[in-house]
């Protein structure tokens, strides 16, 4: 029996038959070789998703104009025939597992920086700066526009020659094609700008000439932002007009997205966005066209995806970050094992934050194998079965226990609390972070599936552990909040609290109560957000020049917008010198004194590792001890999970 019959029914794009309605949308990975060629690491990554049962893979954005059109550090290239062999190998590998593959061809336009384009000034239809990146583009000449059109055509011809099943034109998210279509970014007065029809000339000319070059029947997908969610940009009404014109031009499928860089959270949603919030856009577009429509946007559960198809709101569902988190999402859903799916929590840390803003290779908080599928293609059994004791039931400890058990070891996990989760429990209490509970629940269920013996509500001291005669002990004892050396921060003060206790619901606050949060890092800002949503008047005091600098940038961008709405204020560049019953005293860089009124004060100064004494005692007993997660080095969930996986893999 096939579960989710609509989701797993065959779909059709033009004459191309696709085995189900699940699409992996294009998502940049930085897994290409530095010269823009296809790497084995990239092939392994896509093969894992094809093997996992996805119907159609749309390859991440491939630049047609190097380096002018480049927008990420290790971006694929197809501006020369020499790159075709790698793409052919990729397509062949994906096809061997029954999936189809399209290539998204792309030009960044103004949404890039000289640091990426090897010093070249970004180009655009008009010299409208990108405020998100702080870049000033120059206006393209008519001759340059004609040259870029030809480069799109050449890339499409090469894609077909490399055995790709179709192409996708990236007209969404404010890149060059979208810039021509939008009145916000296209202020030309020649044949490529002005009226709606002239703004559409650039994409329509690309489509016309591609069809002439590759044939009428070669599938073309067009991705566009049905609503740019920014002042002066295209709205859904313009999106409907765009869709009609694209259908008339011979496009075979519409991939309906949203947003541009200036409205970044609408295209790369942080965790507060609800599942499927963008589906209504595809639904409205579908009403005005007769070609298939792909919807996208925080689609995490097969039950939700099934309903979209069953209700006719879209013809295909794009599962993006969900397939990074779990390449077997389709396979598990089809087999009725949807409860085993490791769902994306929309943290954006490894797939977007580190990749886009630090030029790192793709990673995933919940999937430590993402981007390294060739190395960890399968959990290999250890040559000798060992007894492994894990101390600590947070994300690092649970991941370590799961990995060690899957490698064939006997694993016992100790957690001093009655329930598992560690800091995941606290993190999920922050506004918009409820998805973190998905991961906590998955880890707990996976412990059971892996056969880990869990002993919760037990404090594992050295004697208890030694009595088990373990071969290895993995310490995942986490961290604890730091109490600063500030006068008045003493624990006996009844108006001073730790941020963790606030997020854990251990402290009550009255509406309109004035609260000062000392520390403007991630924990401090999330605590301030939590309190403000409960009606408190919150001020953050931070010694650095800005707040939330340790946050993933898109989530930070979104949070700052929420702070403005909630009236949260920040005093930066100030050091708190004393906590008093009616507020806090602080001093600025130039020695200027300040006093911020408060009924209650919350400490969010940071954390320090826990477990050093236990480690030393165990080692003195001759036990092999490995330390992971915050107990080793305080970091984010992604660091904890990765360290747990790596240490367990090596045992």
UniProtKB/Swiss-Prot annotation:
Q: How is it modified after translation?
A: The N-terminus is blocked.
Q: Which GO terms label this protein's molecular function in UniProt?
A: 4 iron, 4 sulfur cluster binding; FMN binding; metal ion binding; NADH dehydrogenase activity
Keywords recorded for this protein, A-Z: 4Fe-4S, FAD, Flavoprotein, FMN, Iron, Iron-sulfur, Metal-binding, NAD, Oxidoreductase
Q: Where does FAD bind?
A: 396, 415, 423, 433, 460
- Which positions are annotated as binding [4Fe-4S] cluster? 344, 347, 351, 364
Catalytic class of the enzyme: oxidoreductase
Enzyme Commission number, as recorded: 1.-.-.-
The residues that the entry says bind FMN are: 104, 223, 320-321
Question: What GO biological process terms are annotated to this protein in UniProt?
Answer: catabolic process
| Pfam families associated with the record | Oxidored_FMN (PF00724), Pyr_redox_2 (PF07992)
Q: Which cofactor does it need?
A: FMN; FAD; [4Fe-4S] cluster
Q: Where is the catalytic site?
A: 175 (proton donor)
What's its catalytic activity? A + NADH + H(+) = AH2 + NAD(+)
Primary role: Reduces a range of alternative electron acceptors.
Q: Which family does it belong to?
A: In the N-terminal section; belongs to the NADH:flavin oxidoreductase/NADH oxidase family.
Q: Subunit structure, per the record?
A: Homohexamer.
Task: Tell me what this protein is called.
Answer: NADH oxidase
């Amino acid at each position: 029996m096939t579960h989710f019959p609509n989701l797993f029914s065959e779909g059709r794009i033009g004459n191309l038959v696709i085995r189900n309605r699940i699409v992996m949308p294009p998502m940049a990975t930085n897994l290409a070789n530095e010269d823009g060629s296809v790497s084995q690491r990239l092939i392994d990554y896509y093969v894992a998703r094809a093997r996992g049962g996805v119907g159609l893979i749309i390859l991440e954005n491939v630049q047609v104009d190097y380096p002018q059109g480049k927008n990420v550090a290790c971006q694929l290239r197809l501006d020369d025939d020499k790159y075709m062999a790698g793409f052919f190998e990729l397509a062949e590998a994906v096809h061997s597992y029954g999936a189809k593959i399209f290539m998204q061809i792309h030009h960044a336009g103004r949404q890039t920086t000289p640091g990426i384009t090897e010093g070249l000034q970004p180009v655009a239809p008009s010299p409208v700066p990108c405020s998100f990146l702080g870049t000033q583009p120059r206006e393209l000449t008519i001759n340059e526009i004609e040259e870029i059109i030809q480069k799109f055509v050449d890339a499409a011809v090469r894609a077909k020659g490399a055995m790709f099943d179709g192409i996708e034109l990236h007209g969404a998210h404010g890149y060059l094609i979208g810039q021509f279509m939008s009145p916000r970014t296209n202020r030309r007065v020649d044949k490529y700008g002005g009226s709606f029809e002239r703004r559409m000339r650039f994409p329509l000319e690309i489509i016309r000439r591609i069809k002439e070059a590759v044939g009428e029947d070669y599938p073309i997908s067009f991705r566009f932002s049905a609503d740019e969610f920014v002042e002066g940009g295209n709205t859904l009404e313009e999106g409907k007009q765009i869709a009609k014109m694209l259908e008339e031009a011979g496009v075979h499928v519409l991939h309906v997205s949203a947003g541009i860089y200036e409205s970044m959270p609408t295209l790369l949603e942080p965790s507060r966005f609800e599942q499927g919030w963008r589906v209504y856009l595809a639904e409205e577009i579908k009403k005005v066209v007769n070609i298939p429509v792909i919807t996208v946007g925080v689609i995490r559960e097969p039950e939700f995806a099934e309903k979209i198809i069953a209700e006719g709101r879209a013809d295909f569902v794009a599962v993006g970050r969900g397939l990074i988190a779990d390449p077997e999402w389709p396979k598990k859903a089809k087999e009725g094992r949807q409860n085993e799916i490791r769902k994306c929590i929309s943290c954006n840390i490894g797939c977007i934050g580190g990749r886009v803003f630090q030029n790192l290779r793709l990673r995933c908080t919940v999937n430590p194998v993402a981007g390294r599928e060739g190395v960890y293609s399968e959990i290999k059994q250890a040559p000798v079965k060992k007894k492994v004791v894990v101390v600590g039931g947070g994300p690092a400890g649970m991941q370590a226990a799961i990995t060690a058990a899957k490698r064939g070891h006997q694993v016992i996990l100790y957690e001093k609390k009655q329930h598992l989760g560690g800091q995941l429990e606290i993190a999920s209490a922050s506004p918009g972070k409820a998805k973190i509970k998905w991961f906590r629940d998955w880890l707990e269920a996976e412990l059971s599936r892996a056969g880990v013996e869990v002993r919760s509500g037990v404090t594992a001291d050295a004697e208890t552990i030694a009595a088990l005669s373990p071969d290895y002990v993995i310490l995942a004892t986490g961290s604890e909040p730091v109490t600063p050396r500030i006068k008045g921060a003493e624990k006996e003060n009844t108006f001073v609290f730790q941020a963790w206790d606030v997020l854990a619901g251990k402290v009550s606050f009255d509406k309109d109560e004035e609260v000062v949060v000392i520390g403007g890092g991630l924990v401090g800002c999330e605590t301030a957000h939590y309190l403000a949503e409960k009606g408190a008047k919150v001020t953050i005091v931070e010694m650095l020049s800005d707040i939330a600098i340790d946050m993933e940038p898109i989530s930070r961008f979104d949070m700052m917008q929420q702070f403005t709405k909630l009236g949260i204020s920040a005093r930066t560049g100030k050091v708190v010198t004393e906590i008093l019953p009616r507020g806090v005293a602080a001093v600025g860089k130039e020695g200027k004194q300040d006093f911020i009124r408060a009924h209650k004060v919350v400490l969010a100064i940071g954390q320090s590792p826990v477990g050093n004494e236990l480690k030393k005692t165990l080692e003195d007993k001759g036990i092999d001890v490995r330390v992971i997660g915050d107990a080793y080095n305080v970091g984010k969930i992604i660091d904890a999970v990765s360290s747990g996986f790596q240490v367990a893999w090596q045992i």
